[in-house]
């Protein structure tokens, strides 16, 4: 695989979205901002929502929808790498934001569900009817770990539903090509889960005690981050520590790993 570096100096970039003009819009989690990287590598500021913009997607109205973790991480330097660590003491929760790409205007559309504050929204994917799924990563402090959840919401801000709760560090989320299954990854367990859907936003109750149908795990120590699903159904998973992208084919035992010379691969998008 040929790899080229497009831009440097970004503050923990994630959530890339490939635009029609060849640019990439992404978040800088540690910078609290959203940035466009042009084809020649030049950077342009889109918005500065603050907190910790984490996941990003284009909605049906052409706006950016942002999973903002509310500054859920502090950062440490380790072996020349910047690594997310425990939440700072001032972290109070996160939110879902809508951002006008042209003006940079930021609007909070969700920060609670059923009266409970969103902890740290992480990744987001839209379905074909204009609703979106997102993960809430939960948080880690010196007192322990707070579980996360999987949500479904309407883009107009009118309804949000917690579909699964008590998940351990849910991160990447994607939909099967037919839209009948939502896949999500857990970072700390290094597992990929699938949840069959009965209709948009409604999951099937899975027998037993698992939070979905087990869809895969890396054969060794690895953490999972974001994911995308290809047209053929393979779930491409950013695989931390293993240094690459691991492709799972839910419902089969097929697993493929593409090495990348970086131990902390955190996000991916389709483009071109």
Report each predicted region and the residues it spans.
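Beta-propeller domains
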Residues: 24-47
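Beta-rich, blade/repeat-based domains predominating
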Residues: 6-23, 49-80, 90-95, 113-132, ...
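A short loop-to-beta-strand structural motif that recurs across blades of beta-propeller domains
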Residues: 33-35, 94-97, 148-151, 191-193, ...
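Short, solvent-exposed loop/turn segments at conserved positions within beta-propeller repeat blades
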Residues: 29-30, 74-93, 138-148, 187-189, ...
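Hydrophobic/aromatic beta-strand positions that recur at structurally equivalent sites within the blades
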Residues: 27, 36-38, 99, 153, ...
């Amino acid at each position: 695989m040929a790899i080229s570096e497009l831009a440097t100096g970004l503050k923990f970039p994630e959530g890339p979205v490939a635009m029609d003009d060849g640019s990439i819009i992404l978040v800088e989690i540690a910078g609290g901002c959203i940035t466009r990287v042009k084809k020649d590598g030049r950077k342009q500021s889109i918005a500065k929502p603050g907190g910790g913009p984490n996941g990003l997607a284009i909605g049906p109205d052409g706006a950016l929808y942002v999973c903002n973790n509310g500054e859920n991480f502090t950062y440490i330097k380790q072996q020349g790498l910047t690594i997310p660590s425990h939440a700072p003491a001032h972290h109070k929760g996160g939110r879902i934001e809508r951002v006008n790409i042209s003006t940079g205007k930021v609007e909070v559309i969700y920060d609670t569900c059923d009266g409970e504050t969103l902890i740290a929204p992480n990744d987001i994917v839209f379905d074909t009817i204009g609703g979106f799924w997102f993960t809430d990563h939960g948080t880690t402090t010196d007192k322990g770990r707070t579980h996360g959840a999987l949500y479904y919401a309407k883009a107009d801000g009118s309804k949000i539903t917690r579909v699964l709760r008590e998940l351990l560090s849910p991160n990447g989320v994607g939909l099967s090509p037919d839209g009948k299954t939502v896949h999500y990854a857990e970072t700390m367990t290094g597992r990929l889960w699938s949840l069959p859907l009965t209709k948009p936003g409604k999951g099937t109750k899975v027998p037993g005690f698992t939070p979905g149908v087990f869809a895969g795990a890396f054969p060794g120590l690895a953490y999972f981050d974001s994911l995308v699903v290809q047209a053929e159904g393979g779930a491409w998973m950013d695989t931390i520590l293993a240094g690459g992208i691991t492709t799972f084919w839910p419902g089969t035992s097929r697993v493929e790993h593409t090495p990348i010379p970086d131990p902390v691969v955190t996000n991916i998008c389709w483009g071109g």
